[in-house]
């Protein structure tokens, strides 16, 4: 990653997100701390269950394992610093720390977007082509899709971070956010950023809209197949599908509000509330929706904890 432009005269940023709330910052600290611990416990539990349950050593649960790992890292990049700033009068962050946070935040965020699209395709094959599932989604393809998601996500993050680091910052240094995100940092640049903003907008479309459309296509076929199943199993699958789509719409919808709009309408106070949705809420919901509601995961969790597991009588 290149350093900031040599003409930069600002040596640090001040993150002013939530500063106007005064004494309510202590309450926010408690709320975010509890949410963060819940996210960590849920995701670490999922990773441990998948790791120590040989029955879950399949591509589908491999995707869930990596998503849980990525979600844990994703929140680790943002929330610990936010917790410190909520209790401190000093809310500064150096250029290098800001660039590092931006890079890893974008890297894990992009990886998550791509992984969820991969998981949508995995569900499409499992439900629409069950007899061919193991032939299509084998372990080799699973590893390739995971590697491709991570490599693509961090490559996009590297390009985006370098584009922002090349901008000139020579005046205001108050970032109207609780972490270093693209829009509020770009707003502080004192040179024309139109061309670079266009490039960043193109990257945002690539990592948000393309996976979102692929997910909609996958789940369109899934819903069509499920509706043809006239049983309780079909209704249960439909409810599961609906819960997945709800989280998808919340995640990609909020991300679109922030990243797919003109600069003139960016970096407002409302953005901080929207950002909480995809930096805290969806990482909290994903383990519940994709894993902890899954029967096989719950059964494996009981076995890991040494709890009795009900078995069907023949």
From Swiss-Prot:
Q: Does the keyword DNA-binding apply?
A: no
Which key words tag this protein in UniProt? Cell membrane, Disulfide bond, G-protein coupled receptor, Glycoprotein, Membrane, Olfaction, Receptor, Sensory transduction, Transducer, Transmembrane, Transmembrane helix
For side Extracellular, which residue ranges? 1-26, 77-100, 162-198, 259-271
Q: Please tell me where this protein is predominantly located.
A: membrane
Topological type in the membrane: Multi-pass membrane protein
Record topological domains on the Cytoplasmic side = 48-55, 122-140, 219-237, 293-314
Which residues are glycosylated according to the annotation?
5
State the Gene Ontology BP annotations. detection of chemical stimulus involved in sensory perception of smell
What disulfide bonds does the UniProt entry report for this chain? 98-190
Question: Record's GO cellular component, any one?
Answer: plasma membrane
What molecular functions are annotated in GO for this chain?
G protein-coupled receptor activity; odorant binding; olfactory receptor activity
Q: Which InterPro entries match?
A: GPCR_Rhodpsn, GPCR_Rhodpsn_7TM, Olfact_rcpt
Q: Name one Pfam family in it.
A: 7tm_4
Span-the-membrane segments of this chain are 27-47, 56-76, 101-121, 141-161, 199-218, 238-258, 272-292
Q: Where in the cell is it found?
A: Cell membrane
The record describes the protein's role as: Odorant receptor.
Family from the record? Belongs to the G-protein coupled receptor 1 family.
By what name is this protein known? Olfactory receptor 10T2
């Amino acid at each position: 990653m290149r350093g900031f432009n040599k003409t930069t005269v600002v040596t640090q940023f001040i993150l002013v997100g939530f500063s106007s709330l005064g004494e309510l910052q202590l309450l926010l600290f408690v709320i975010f701390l509890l949410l963060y611990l819940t996210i960590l416990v849920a995701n670490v539990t999922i990773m441990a269950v998948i790791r120590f349950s040989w029955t879950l050593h399949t591509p589908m649960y491999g995707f869930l394992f990596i998503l849980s790992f990525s979600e844990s890292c994703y929140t680790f990049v943002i929330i610990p610093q936010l917790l410190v700033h909520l209790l401190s009068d000093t809310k500064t962050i150096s250029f290098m720390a800001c660039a590092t946070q931006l890079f890893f935040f974008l890297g894990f965020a992009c990886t998550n977007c791509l992984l969820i699209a991969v998981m949508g395709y995995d569900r499409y094959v499992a439900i629409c082509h069950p007899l061919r599932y193991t032939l299509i989604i084998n372990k080799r393809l699973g590893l390739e899709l995971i590697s491709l998601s991570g490599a693509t996500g961090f490559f996009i993050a590297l390009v985006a971070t370098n584009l922002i680091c090349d901008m000139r910052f020579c005046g205001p240094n108050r970032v109207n956010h609780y972490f270093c995100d693209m829009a509020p940092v770009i707003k502080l640049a004192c040179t024309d950023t139109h061309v670079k903003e266009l490039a960043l907008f193109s990257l945002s479309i690539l990592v948000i809209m393309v996976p979102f459309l692929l997910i909609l296509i996958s789940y369109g076929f899934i819903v069509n197949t499920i509706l043809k199943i006239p049983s309780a199993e079909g209704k249960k699958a439909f409810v599961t599908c609906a819960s997945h789509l709800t989280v998808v719409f919340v995640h990609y919808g909020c991300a679109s509000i922030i990243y797919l709009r003109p600069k003139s309408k960016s970096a407002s106070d409302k953005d901080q509330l929207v950002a909480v949705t995809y930096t805290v809420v969806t990482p909290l919901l994903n383990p519940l929706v994709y894993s902890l509601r899954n029967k096989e995961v719950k059964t494996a969790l009981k076995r890991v904890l040494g709890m009795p597991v009900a078995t069907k009588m023949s």
